[in-house]
Structures are given as structure tokens and as C-alpha cells.
Amino acid sequence: MSVSESHDIQLVIITGMSGAGKTVAIQSFEDLGYFCVDNLPPSLLPKFLELMKESNSKMSKVALVMDLRGREFFDRLIEALDEMAENPWITPRILFLDAKDSILVTRYKETRRSHPLAATGLPLEGIALERELLEELKGRSQIIYDTSDMKPRDLREKIVKHFATNQGETFTVNVMSFGFKYGIPIDADLVFDVRFLPNPYYIESMRPLTGKDKEVSSYVMKWNETQKFNEKLIDLLSFMLPSYKREGKSQVVIAIGCTGGQHRSVTLAENLADYFKKDYYTHVTHRDIEKRSRK
């Protein structure tokens, strides 16, 4: 389903339960070329849109995250939505992200964060209050996603499919680094083993670092065999990806593995994603980068 172009500004308001995936959502819209604002106070929404209209901005696609922290914010957002309904140059949509209570509690425990509305620190208390506050807004939402069984990549792909303005944006290249010692990713379409490359792990100063650090990536990429492999891999994928897309595949998961998923695979995955992002919607993840604690 494509976004209509019948109005000047296509507006997506991202809201929903805390922990349901709003951060992933706003990042996905940013990758789709939306002008994104996180946590804009509802009282500023009408003025913000007026300023965009008056500035003759070419930013016709806007995505906003609206987090509710109390009844006052909620009431003001409802008023702002009513005001927007009278503006013919705005096409507003509300994307509501939800998840089961048990899943939200688990996510809060994993991140060790407190629910913003939990006065006592108990997640279920905040979740119950938030559901009550958001009930009317959920009823007004045009799009509702239950992210209970979604990984971040699944949510990204769903958003891309729904909001992409052309067919090319619906094909996703997911690049993943991993460590063979933790197993090969079961959802990988293509797996490449880079354990033959020189390993920074054996250099003491680089051991606690990862392939996202400049010192490590420079070391990995300085070798002739790394450069040749990277060149051949890009050449191979440049041939394969258009064929995958032509066959109607919505995404390709490219997994690059080294021993622990910290250095070589991370460097190559970052390079690969950076190269292909000019032609495809590209997302990079490092599955095992947090498995080993830094010292």
C-alpha cells in the first residue's frame, strides 16, 4: 500500500505502548526519507506543521513520535488531531504500536529500564495506566501493529512494505554479523565465512574493541586479502540482489561470520551495508557484538 500524494504533507504520527517499538519505527521512517521528529509535544504539532507549510519545504513526508506522559498530553493531542482534520493540505495517519503485557514486561527487564508511568517502578502498573490513557487514541488509529512476535527487523520490513512510495523501497537488504561459536543464523539466506582474514583479537589493544571502532576496522581492511574479498563479495551481490528483487523476494538476509562476531564480521558487515544503501533499503545488525563484555 503506497502513501497517497494528493496532499502537500503526508503525516504519520507514531504512538502506542512504551516498549512496543517506537524507536525502531522512527528509524525506519527516516530510512524511507521522512522528516522525523522524536517526542514532539502535542501542543506544538499544529504550529510545527504550519511552519513547514509556510517555509515551502520539500519535506512532504513527516513522521512524528508522540509519547504520552500523562492526561494533559493526551487531551492536547486529541485537540491537535481535530484541528488537523480541518486542514486539506495534511494527510494524517496514526500508527499505533502495541504488544502483549507479558512481552512489554520482558522487554523492560531486558533493557533494565523503568516504565515512564510506573510510579512504584513496577512495569505492570505503568502498562495498565498507559493502556487506559491510550484507549481513545488507539480507536482513532488507522494502522495498528501488534509487535509481540516481531523482531526489530520484522517491524522495519512491515513499515517499509506499508509506507514505501515506490516498489524499489519495498526490497530490503539485511546485513548481519555473527560469531560461528554461537551458531549460524537460522534466518540467513546467504552466509559468508571471514575467519580466514587476519584476526584483531590477538592484538591486545584491539581485543576489547569491535569492528565498529576505527582502529579495528582499519586493521581488518588494510590487508590485501580483505580488500580482494570485499571487492569480490560486492561484485557477487551486485549480480545477485537484482535477481532476488526481480523474483519478488521482499528481503535478503546476508550473514557474515567470524569466530566471535566482534571484529572481522562486524567490519565487513558495516562496509557491505554502507555500499548497498545507495541502491536498496539496507539494515545492518550485529547479532553477537554484546555477547562478550568489554574490559
UniProtKB/Swiss-Prot annotation:
Binding site for GTP: D67, L68, R69, G70
Highest taxon of source: Bacteria
Family matches, as InterPro entries: P-loop_NTPase, RapZ-like, RapZ-like_N, RapZ_C
A Pfam family recorded for this sequence: RapZ-like_N
MF terms (GO), sorted A to Z: ATP binding; GTP binding; molecular adaptor activity
Keyword ATP-binding: yes
Disrupted gene: phenotype observed: Cells lacking this gene show a reduction in transformation efficiency and in fraction of cells that express competence.
Keyword Disulfide bond on entry: no
Key words of the record: ATP-binding, GTP-binding, Nucleotide-binding
Residues involved in ATP binding: G16, M17, S18, G19, A20, G21, K22, T23
Family statement: Belongs to the RapZ-like family.
Record's function text: Displays ATPase and GTPase activities. Can also hydrolyze pNPP. May affect the expression of competence via the phosphorylation of a cellular component.
Protein name: Nucleotide-binding protein YvcJ
